[in-house]
């Protein structure tokens, strides 16, 4: 998992980075959004990771 940058916006932690395709959808990579608290503590798992569009960190 390559995470380039983390930021909290409007109570939502936006992780700018990519993950293997098997983690989310059939695409090669996906950007992630996780709960702000989970982001702060670094506790991110597949169950709380959501794809938000095309990954720009290829």
UniProtKB/Swiss-Prot annotation:
Q: Which domain of life is it from?
A: Bacteria
Q: What is its EC number?
A: 1.8.1.7
Alphabetical UniProt keywords:
Cytoplasm, Disulfide bond, FAD, Flavoprotein, NADP, Oxidoreductase, Redox-active center
InterPro entries listed in its UniProt record: Pyr_OxRdtase_I_AS (IPR012999)
Q: Give the catalysed reaction(s), semicolon-separated.
A: 2 glutathione + NADP(+) = glutathione disulfide + NADPH + H(+)
Cofactor(s) needed by this chain: FAD
Q: Which cysteines are joined by disulfide bonds?
A: 13-18
Task: Indicate the enzyme's highest-level EC class.
Answer: oxidoreductase
Additional information? The active site is a redox-active disulfide bond.
Its family? Belongs to the class-I pyridine nucleotide-disulfide oxidoreductase family.
What quaternary structure, including any partners, is listed in this protein's UniProt entry?
A: Homodimer.
Recorded protein name is: Glutathione reductase
